[in-house]
Design a protein with these regions (language model features):
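Nucleic-acid-processing active sites and adjacent nucleic-acid-binding tracks
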Residues: 135
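Structural signal for short hydrophobic segments within the conserved structured cores
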Residues: 161-165
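Outer-membrane beta-barrel proteins
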Residues: 168-170
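Cofactor-binding active-site loop characterized by glycine-rich and histidine/acidic residues
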Residues: 1-130, 140-160
């Protein structure tokens, strides 16, 4: 039920999450999106995007790192809702926001603004239930990320906890 703001290469996450929600035709929906079909349930054919309302995945285009500030805002709203319960809410009390991004995206100005906002908020002890997931695979479109840069850059940031893991080690 947690909301997931996905990197534009995260179709596998969306496909796997669809397994948890009966009645989803995610492969078909993605094909409609990739073909810019007016029947695409998330964009109506306007653009190839990942996303699904039923899966709590807001639409995301291929604009680099544009979803990170939105994820920070959503996480801030969850923290705010815990302090001042709204009349209506869409997510459970224990929800978090997951936000994935690629290693090359980490250097983009919108990503830096999102990280800074998350750190600034944490420094003030304002609740922001947010999990950033960096896919550090060295596959940047235009800018290669030096080996070890993500770990070195995130390991000691105030207000952020960095946990390296091997995404290929699934057992």
């Amino acid at each position: 039920t947690d909301m997931a703001f996905l990197h534009y290469r995260d179709a596998a996450f969306q496909i796997q999450r669809a397994e948890q929600v009966p009645g989803q035709s995610i492969a078909w929906d993605m094909l409609l999106s990739f073909a810019c079909s007016s029947d695409d349930p998330i964009s109506g054919g306007r653009h190839k995007v990942l996303g699904s309302k039923a899966l709590n995945i807001p639409p995301q285009t291929s604009t680099i790192a544009s979803h990170l500030p939105k994820a920070v805002g959503a996480a801030y709203s969850l923290g705010l809702a815990r302090r001042h319960p709204p009349e209506h809410k869409a997510l459970p009390d224990d929800a978090i926001i997951m936000c994935s991004f690629g290693d090359a995206s980490a250097n983009h100005s919108t990503a830096q603004g999102a990280f800074n906002t998350a750190q600034w908020t944490a420094y003030q002890s304002v609740p922001m239930p947010l999990l950033f997931v960096c896919e550090d695979n060295g596959i940047g479109i235009s800018t290669k990320t030096p080996k070890g840069w993500i770990g070195a850059n995130f390991a000691d940031r105030p207000g952020l906890k960095y946990f390296p893991c091997d995404g290929l080690d699934i057992y």
